[in-house]
Amino acid sequence: MYLRKIKLANFRSFQETEIELQKDLTVFVGENNGGKSNAIDAIRLLTIPLGGRREIYCEGTDIRFQSTRPDFEIVGEFEELSTGQQGRLISAATDVSLTRAAFGLNFSADRLGARPTLWAGKDGNTPEPGCHEMIRHVYLPTLRDAKRSLASGNPTRIMALLTHFLDGSSPAELAKDLARTQSHDVLQKVDGAVDKGLQALTSGVRRQTASLGFASDEALVDIARDLRFKLADHGVDPEDLRYSGHGYANLLFMATIAVELEKVRTADLTLFLVEEPEAHLHPQLQAAVLSFLRDQAAHSRSSPPDDGSLAGELQVVVATHSPNLSAWVANERLVLFKSVAVPVPPSDSEKAEPEPQLADAAVIESSAASETSSPGELKEGVVDATMTAAAMRRSTRVIPLCQLPLDDGERRKIDRYLDVTKAALLFGGRVLLVEGIAEALLLPIVAKHHTLKSHPEKLRLFMSTVFVPIDGVDFAPYIKLLLTSINDARIADRLVVMTDGDRAVDEDKDEEDDGAAQDEINESAGVGPSPISEDNGESALVREEVAQALKREEDEGDTQAKTVDPVIPGERRKKEFDDLATSLGGIDHFRAITSIYSLETELIEAGNVDILRNVYLDLHPRSRRKWDKAVALSGDARAKAIHKIFKTTRKGDFAQMLAKRIEDGEAFKVPAYIGDAIEAVVS
């Protein structure tokens, strides 16, 4: 059995929402204030804590703010009930096969002292005694200081562990066995010394005697209060927790919970709800935590009972902000939470006042978008933005990635990309997709020092954008991922794709010039180039070769004009991406931008020959003739030559060195398509 779906109506930030969960592990991801903790709390309210003691209760403040309804509802749908579970949860069954069940919680605040109403199967149906207790939860909050939670004076965790290992004995018997001795010589000496003075003080009235020792009626909880965990690297004597870091203390705390879950078979299903398990952990430990949680869930289902007894199954739900954790699981297990602005119902709009947070945000956004406006226009824009905020309200939308229209190949491609790059692809409202690392490195520098240099608000917006180099031109899976609308929401608020035009670049692999390739090999090995002298004779040779190349270019131009497809590869891709965005209903959130040639050629065409020549020769100090020969050409011939010499250039190194020269203030002109892409992101 597992929780397949949780439905929320009018609960906190949710209007009408369904959250689909996976059988063993589901990861809630998304922005701050997106509603992840609200969903976790909904599960906590619907189910009973494993320890029996509730920490949260239904309150009037759980009802959606400014809602016209005075109530909320939480419904959990469960699937794949075993035979024994079908019998125990028969009153909650929702189909004739008895393999599905549901529990619901209604709460209304329209009367004083209102209490939640629990139903099973369908609204109004009271669950049989003990039926609801078969589904429990364990809540692990964000651990900011696990050392304090495990420290002396807070016996909760240690007491729970001791209780689960009683193995038939009682807490009183264990306390008796753990009782501390009071017969030590030092204690007796203290008794004698104190008793001598006490006798002198009390013998004239009523003589007293004293004894120093531990409480004779010491309970197990008192002993647990004095027990302390110690921790250290393997092979080193454990030390007090105060000498350990927060991260490993968090893992120790999590391990104590796992022991408790392993030992308990008092429920058919236990939901392990974990918030921000990445707290205080470096990436490798975050991966270990996620693997541990997944293994715990799998282990709980590895040996189901064959006698119809309680199954003790475990289902894990994790809420996180960590790109590392979201990248280490298959995307089908991810549920994205997103906060969107929705209109106020008509019945409320006339009397609703602007929510302070929305009004403030509207003013800030209006100001950021009006840097060049006059004072009068700016004031009018702020007023309009504030009035718009009065008619809007924040609402949580969820996007289960398992519902995205991706085939298996596309899903695996996205999983592999996220696993390798740990990109914050799922956390950014604005996303810029580019072909390779060179564009991803250069665009922020170009925006900062040129395109958005005079627009600080736009620059801040651009710098918060997620830059995604996909190392290719197959953008379609990422466009589907980011623009598909589920529950009236999509991952990306703004998506820009920048792709090369690739005119004059053969789609098939170019034949390498053997001499040039040998020069590259020699250069990498520190050996001299092919024997060509760098003198005036070489210059004459270069001029002759350039003249011949120009003649060939002219002849080839006439032929290509008749035979080449007038639509260049970049334009074909742009049309495909625009059509895809339109089919997904996200064209208003999308912009595809292409050039005519490749990145390097476009940089040259924009007038950056000198700065690019310096960078290229820094990387290839023996290739001056090759560079001059290529740049001396024009049009498609130059594009082919530039493409050819850059095929043996390390793109990342090239972009890094060019970025440094731009930062140092060397003359640089921004290619039009790069400027358009930067502006499109912040528009």
Label the model's feature ranges.
Residues 1-48, 230-421, 663-675, 679-683:
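Switch/communication elements of ASCE P-loop NTPase nucleotide-binding domains
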Residues 40-96:
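Conserved P-loop NTP-binding catalytic core
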Residues 48-71, 267, 299-312, 338, ...:
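Flexible phosphate/Mg2+-sensing switch loops adjacent to catalytic phosphate-binding sites
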Residues 82-173:
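Electropositive, glycine-dotted interaction segments
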Residues 149-152, 159-274, 295, 301-304, ...:
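Extended helical coiled-coil dimerization/tether regions that scaffold
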Residues 422, 427-509:
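Conserved helicase/translocase motor-coupling segment
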Residues 496-643:
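Activity-critical C-terminal alpha-helical subdomain
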Residues 608, 615-618, 627-683:
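Terminal low-complexity/disordered tails
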